[in-house]
């Protein structure tokens, strides 16, 4: 299939770019105020305050990362219009505390605010991260309820 402007190919590219921008802005804002570890092989030199931890094996290391992190962040690809991202299930299944962007299906299967937390925009994400980092018992209670 050939690439043509104005087709689904272009829309997908745009959505991926938007997701990358949202992730960058979130990490830049959060790392300016909090200690942020990122498990990724892609290092963005602009994110000077982010602590890159490299690749984490999905089966052996990621469950430990999810369960031991004070906050796990999910920013879904904009191409995921419906459904619950696997990362949400992974984090909750490991007993981790999750802040995620809102996906409509989440409210069908999860008790938002009691099993996980969702944010509306980058500013809301920052405020919720700030709140839950200073409310340890509430954060732990939500993490346990999500299992």
Regions found by a protein language model. Give the residues of each.
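A short, well-ordered alpha-helix in the C-terminal region of glycosyltransferases
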Residues: 138-147
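Short alpha-helix at the nucleotide-sugar/activated-sugar donor binding site of glycosyltransferases
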Residues: 90-92
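Conserved acidic donor-binding segment of nucleotide-sugar-dependent glycosyltransferases
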Residues: 116-122, 132-136
